[in-house]
Regions:
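Beta-strand-dominated extracellular/periplasmic modules and repeats
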Residues: 19-169, 182, 186-193
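N-terminal secretory signal peptides and thylakoid transit peptides that target proteins
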Residues: 1-13
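Short, exposed beta-strand-loop hairpins at the edges of beta-sheets
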Residues: 176-178
Length: 193
C-alpha cells in the first residue's frame, strides 16, 4: 500500500501514455547477469551513492498486470563496478515477484558508469518459462546533477553519452523526480507475449 502512495500519482500519467500496450523494446541482457542473487527490495548494501527508488509495472500485450513474474534488476555501483564480476558480493542486484497489480519496487543507487556505456539499469523478467530482457537509461541532465556529487564526482561525467551508446533508445529513458537526497522513477514494462 505504501508503494502506491509513493508512486501512484507519478505512475498514473505514464500508464495513460502507454495505453496502446505496445511492447517495450527488448535489449540484450548483457554479460553480467547472475541468477543466484537475493530476493529483496533494497539493493544498496550500505554502499555510498545517490538513492534511487524505482517502481516497475509489468503487463502483457493486452495491458493486463502480470502477477508472479520474477523481475531481476542489476547495475553498477557508484564507481562503475558490477558485483560478482568486478567486486565480490551481490550489491546492486536483486529480484522480486510482481504483486497482483504487476508491480515491484526497488530501492537502489544511481549507477556509476564504465568507459564503453552510458549509465543504465539491466532488467530481466521471467514469467511462465518465458524471458524478456531490456535496459533503462537516465536523462543526461540528471546524470550531470548526480555525477557532480560524491562519490561520483571523482570520476566526472561518463565518457559515453546517451546518443553515443549503440543500445540507447529514447523510449527506454526513465522519467525521474527528486525525492529527498535522491530520485524516484517509474516504468511500465509491456512484455511481447
Amino acid at each position: 500500500m505504501q508503494r502506491r502512495a509513493v508512486f501512484g500519482l507519478f505512475l498514473l500519467p505514464l500508464a495513460r501514455g502507454q495505453g496502446t500496450c505496445t511492447p517495450t523494446p527488448a535489449l540484450a541482457q548483457g554479460p553480467y547477469s547472475l541468477r543466484d542473487v537475493p530476493q529483496r527490495e533494497d539493493l544498496r548494501e550500505g554502499l555510498p551513492g545517490v538513492p534511487l527508488r524505482l517502481l516497475l509495472r509489468v503487463r502483457d500485450r493486452a495491458c493486463r498486470p502480470l502477477q508472479g513474474a520474477r523481475v531481476d534488476l542489476w547495475h553498477t555501483d557508484a564507481l562503475g563496478r558490477y558485483s560478482g564480476v568486478h567486486a565480490p558480493g551481490t550489491f546492486c542486484r536483486g529480484w522480486q515477484a510482481t504483486d497482483e497489480r504487476g508491480e515491484v519496487a526497488f530501492l537502489t543507487l544511481f549507477p556509476g558508469w564504465y568507459p564503453s556505456r552510458t549509465p543504465h539499469l539491466h532488467l530481466r523478467v521471467e514469467v511462465g518459462g518465458r524471458v524478456f530482457a531490456t535496459q533503462l537509461f537516465f536523462p543526461e541532465e540528471v546524470q550531470r546533477e548526480v555525477y557532480a556529487l560524491p562519490p561520483y564526482r571523482e570520476r566526472g561525467m561518463p565518457r559515453v553519452n546517451n546518443r553515443q551508446d549503440g543500445l540507447f533508445r529514447a523510449d527506454l529513458l526513465l522519467r525521474l523526480e527528486r525525492e529527498g537526497e535522491g530520485y524516484r522513477g517509474a516504468f511500465v514494462l509491456t512484455l511481447p507475449f
